[in-house]
A protein has these predicted regions:
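Short amphipathic alpha-helical segment within the helicase RecA-like ATPase core
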Residues: 1-234
């Protein structure tokens, strides 16, 4: 999955799907409000009618909204704006991934990192998004004879309204994606059967990882070396 950042007016952005938030307390996030004005207040009408209440776990897909260039708008419930903290933000991202799984999309643009979340800025919000998306993408298949199809997103783009936040957002995405990949590697090793994931196999994986990154080094000890070091659990 590739991550990127764009700075644009939400109504002017051409994308297969634009993911935006809706609060439970009837107040629309600033970017959603801006988009709603361009779309003839369609989101406000849907919220008023009760088609979406804004609770975390809810979503609603709109297609080809007049005045908006995005092919689809995916409205995501974000709960009460006054209670939005990092934990709830992560829950929103998880539900967003589940909602995206229902549609045949390979590319999305997300405005969720523009939400005001207690005590965290754009870098941390971007990091959490990248980490959660990468880890949600993981599926074990190494020893399965029948490979099941699963949702794969090729590109996730963050939409920002402030150009000065681009650098921090990119940094957050890079960190989050790296953490997510590391978590997936650990999960894969844990899921492999013991006759494959042997100490020798783990040693080879560690050495291979070290060759790919100049900041890492690895040394595999023999049984005799471990014994001399007093590692008596052999």
């Amino acid at each position: 999955m590739q991550f990127s950042v764009k700075t644009s007016k939400p109504e002017s952005l051409s994308t297969p799907c634009l993911v935006i938030g809706v609060f439970e307390d009837k107040n629309l996030p600033e970017l959603t409000e801006q988009l709603d004005k361009a779309g003839g207040k369609i989101i406000h009408k849907l919220v008023t009618a009760g088609d979406i209440n804004g609770k975390i776990g809810e979503h609603l897909l709109l297609q080809k909204v007049e005045g908006v260039r995005a092919q689809r708008l995916l409205l995501i419930g974000c709960g009460k704006s006054s209670e939005l903290d990092a934990k709830k933000y992560c829950s929103i991202l998880t539900h967003t991934w589940k909602a995206l799984q229902k549609y045949t999309l390979t590319e999305v643009t997300l405005a969720l990192p523009t939400l005001a979340v207690k005590d965290i800025g754009i870098e941390r919000k971007a990091e959490l998004l990248a980490r959660l998306f990468v880890t949600n993408e993981y599926h074990y298949s190494a020893t399965l004879s029948k490979k099941s199809k699963h949702f794969q997103l090729k590109e996730a783009c963050l939409l920002l309204t402030e150009g000065r936040e681009r650098s921090a957002a990119n940094k957050g995405l890079e960190i989050g994606a790296a953490i997510g990949k590391g978590m997936n590697t650990a999960r894969e090793l844990g899921n492999l059967p013991a006759n494959i994931c042997t100490p020798t196999y783990l040693g080879k994986q560690a050495l291979e990882l070290a060759t790919k990154n100049k900041l890492l080094s690895a040394k595999v000890l023999t049984e005799a070396q471990m014994k001399r070091l007093g590692m008596h659990s052999l």
